[in-house]
């Protein structure tokens, strides 16, 4: 019997890429207007710095997601004043992303239906906490969420066993009574299966499976629309 469904947020409950592209555009426009830095050059420098920070911190540290840290370092490298531009760039990005983004079609309805059927709703996301709270409230998921695990809290990114174990521990049930739903195959699907959970791959964008991956004995469900989710979960329950 399924007692909890745990959702990834970015590119699962909403389309991150659409909002991200517009947020980056807005930051570039600000940089050109207020800092005298070409928008294209600003974005290239931002991406380069992002890679540098990831190399320095590694990929298992939630700090790699901190846009504030990236912007602080970028302004330092550009020899531009940190204040007031750091906070203004931060809000240019996030305010834009939140304004134009929306829940994935059928996602809110699926979460509501599962909750109404007595299934607890959890969140398992690679990110720092504050902005994930904002997204859940803005997109309407907050009233249904009982548990949240971020990589900032867990101390590891998905699919680390300790991240997944914390998800199960907060759910207060056995791993086989949990379903993890996400768009990233290695992190969300394999991470959940290795932890003993059921897994649903939300593949609305038609991604190909990662190459050279041994899936022997790995059973998971692939869906392309959230209309498919609740009937599948309830069939397990």
Which residues does each predicted region cover?
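Asp-based, Mg2+/Mn2+-dependent phosphohydrolase catalytic module
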Residues: 1-5, 18, 33, 40, ...
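N-terminal helical cap/lid subdomain that shapes the substrate entry/recognition surface
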Residues: 2-105
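Short glycine/proline-enriched coil/turn segments at helix->beta-strand junctions
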Residues: 76-79, 117, 196-197
């Amino acid at each position: 019997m399924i007692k909890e469904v745990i959702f990834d947020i970015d590119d699962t409950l909403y389309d991150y890429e659409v909002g991200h592209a517009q947020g980056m555009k807005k930051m570039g426009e600000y940089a050109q207007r207020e800092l005298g830095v070409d928008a294209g050059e600003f974005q290239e420098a931002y991406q380069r710095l992002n890679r540098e920070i990831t190399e320095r911190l590694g990929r298992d540290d939630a700090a790699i997601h901190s846009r504030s840290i990236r912007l602080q370092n970028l302004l330092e490298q550009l020899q531009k004043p940190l204040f007031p531009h750091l906070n203004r760039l931060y809000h240019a990005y996030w305010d834009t992303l939140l304004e134009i983004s929306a829940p994935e079609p059928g996602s809110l309805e699926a979460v509501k239906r599962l909750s109404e059927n007595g299934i607890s709703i959890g969140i398992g996301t690679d990110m720092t906490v504050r902005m994930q709270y904002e997204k859940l409230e803005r997109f309407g998921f907050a009233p249904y969420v009982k548990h949240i695990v971020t990589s900032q809290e867990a101390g590891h990114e998905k699919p680390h066993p300790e991240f997944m174990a914390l998800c199960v521990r907060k759910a207060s049930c056995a791993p086989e009574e949990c379903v993890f739903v996400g768009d990233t195959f290695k992190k969300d699907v394999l991470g959940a299966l290795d932890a003993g959970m059921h897994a649903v791959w939300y593949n609305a964008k038609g991604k190909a499976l990662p190459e050279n991956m041994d899936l022997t004995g790995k059973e998971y469900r692939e869906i392309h629309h959230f209309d498919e989710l609740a009937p599948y979960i309830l069939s397990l329950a």
